[in-house]
From Swiss-Prot:
This is Formimidoylglutamase. Its cofactor is Mn(2+). SUPFAM superfamilies: Arginase/deacetylase. It comes from Halalkalibacterium halodurans (strain ATCC BAA-125 / DSM 18197 / FERM 7344 / JCM 9153 / C-125) (Bacillus halodurans). Mn(2+) 2 binds at D150, H152, D242, D244. NCBIfam families: hutG (TIGR01227). The gene is hutG. Belongs to the arginase family. GO terms for biological process: L-histidine catabolic process to glutamate and formamide; L-histidine catabolic process to glutamate and formate; putrescine biosynthetic process from arginine, via agmatine.
Length: 319
């Protein structure tokens, strides 16, 4: 305020002139051409088979981006050179789950058709949003491969509960949007799945890496193997990150927490590794419930997933 140099608006944050916050490099979409990466929220969680406030996640993850800088000390790289788009959120129907999923598919399909250079980063929401999002991605991009980080197969039958957060990949397989041989599941965890769904995955040619595999072989080795396999038969790769792939100590704000999961450093290294591959052109982050979280730990981890993905893409562009 003029004449009062030390008076500022209420709750004004501290500002360091030499620090750019990650949230500052995402600009609201002006409706013009999107050239590169862009966030879009899909705040649907009514389709969860357990209590979930994941519909609040897009807002909180965006907020958490402001908690971190754009500079990677590990790679001596500043993401501030990027201009990224935030397309906002897809409006969900208050009561209609199938209708909400249809809105996601319609919006994503139109955007991917009209904005062919757009590489989406979709913020769920529960994992049910991956079905319409990936279906739209496949429609626009041709033959796709999917790398799924998850504690669960998410191949539940559709008869018992309909299209919920436990069915996205079954829906993709049964609609023909995705071929089983083009789906790689990483981080599948003990006592979090059932035998019939493991057999379903095997029957359809889904490649499954359990946490035992990750611990024994290392995530980067597994990712190199998975990407090499997919590159022989797909045009692009989409990465779906269910945050419950992380151990409950690292992601307390997931509806389906459990022990024996991945640590956050391993996941972030894997996401960075995938980001460096030009075939990887889309991603979603799901199953973050801010109402269950502790000090926004899970939302902050999700924000770091975004930053490490973009770091990989930035390394690729200058390398």
């Amino acid at each position: 305020m003029k004449g009062y140099p030390f008076l500022d608006k209420a709750n004004a944050p501290f500002v360091d002139r030499h620090v750019t916050k990650a949230g500052e490099i995402f600009y609201p979409w002006d409706g013009k051409r999107i050239d590169g990466f862009g966030l879009i929220g899909a705040p649907l969680s009514k389709s969860s088979i357990s209590h979930s406030g994941a519909s609040f996640a897009p807002t909180v993850i965006r907020k958490c981006l402001h908690a971190f800088s754009t500079y990677s000390v590990e790679e001596d790289l500043d993401l501030a050179q990027l201009k990224l788009t935030d397309l906002g959120d897809i409006t969900m129907h208050v009561t209609d789950i199938v209708g909400s999923q249809a809105r996601i598919e319609e919006t994503m399909t139109k955007l991917l058709e009209n904005e062919q250079n757009w590489q989406p980063i979709v913020l769920g929401g529960d994992h049910s949003i991956s079905f319409p999002s990936i279906k739209a991605f496949a429609s626009a991009k041709g033959t796709i491969g999917v790398i799924q980080f998850d504690a669960h197969h998410d191949l539940r039958n559709l008869e018992d509960g309909g299209p919920c957060n436990g069915t996205p990949f079954r829906s993709l397989l049964e609609t023909g949007s995705l071929v089983g041989e083009h789906l790689v599941q990483i981080g599948i965890r003990d006592f979090s799945n059932s035998y019939p769904y493991r057999k379903y995955a095997e029957k359809h040619g889904v490649k499954v890496y359990t946490m035992k595999d990750v611990n024994a072989r290392g995530l980067l080795t597994i990712l190199d193997e998975a990407v090499a396999k997919l590159k022989r038969s797909v045009d692009v790769i989409y990465v779906s990150v269910d945050m419950d792939v992380l151990d409950q100590a690292h992601a307390p704000g997931c509806p389906a927490i459990g022990p024996g999961g991945m640590d956050s450093t391993t996941l972030l290294q894997g996401i960075f590794h995938l980001g460096k591959d030009s075939l990887v052109q889309g991603m979603d982050i799901v199953e973050v419930d801010p109402t269950l979280d502790f000090r926004e730990m899970t939302s902050r981890a999700a924000a770091h997933v975004i930053l490490n993905y973009l770091k990989g893409k930035c390394i690729k562009s200058i390398g």
